[in-house]
Amino acid sequence: RLVGTTSNVIPFRTYKFQDRAFLEMDEVLGQHDIGVEKSRDLGATWMFLTLFFHHWMFHDFSSFGIMSRTADLVDKPGKKDTLMWKLDFLLNGDGGRGGLPAWMKPAKTYRSMMLMENRDNGSTFEGASTTEDAFRGGRKKAIAIDEYAAFPTGDDYKALAATQHATDCRVFVSTPKGASGAYYDVMHTPSNIRKIILNWTEHPDRGVGLYTSKEGVLEILDKEYKFPEGYKFVLDGKVRAPYYDQ
């Protein structure tokens, strides 16, 4: 949120770590799998959707799949935190805010449940939840699987199998959750997957005042930050900051 405004619609002005991630994803999009390991609330979902949307707009016959652990997280009428709603917002905005200017929009589009078509250039978005038959109907330039580590046990491997032959490029996006499951396997099994790390320590506001500890001994990483007198450091060996300690 921008300082001095209460609006929920703000410009997506990217930070340097987001710029780097955009370029890395775009470099290999459509070629091989991408694994995104992210901290919470760093815009990762908006990032891959925006990248897909750019290709949907400007690259002919670009077909994309988007998946989450339930159908309602992908598309549900009236629900504004679904993946498809975010794509609707990128195109048309909401309540007069956001969206593309009229001159930039495709002349012909089509929208139905779990589907969004650019009929000017033949590009499509198709949504799906975790079923064994997801995206069996045709090849995709890329398929994004959002919050993959949060998929129910079993569904995560079904999604992996269902998407294996549907695209050369699956984008596995998640905050890590334990040392088991399909997301963990994908990120830790040797392969040609392009791994992209989005860590809260790179955020210019949240990464202020970084510190850590070794065997209970404090180590200040951000030498320029002045901690308040009497600050209660947490000496658990993790990289921390006042943001993290809240």
For the regions a language model picked out, list residue spans one by one.
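Phosphate/NTP-binding elements of NTP-utilizing enzymes
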Residues: 1-246
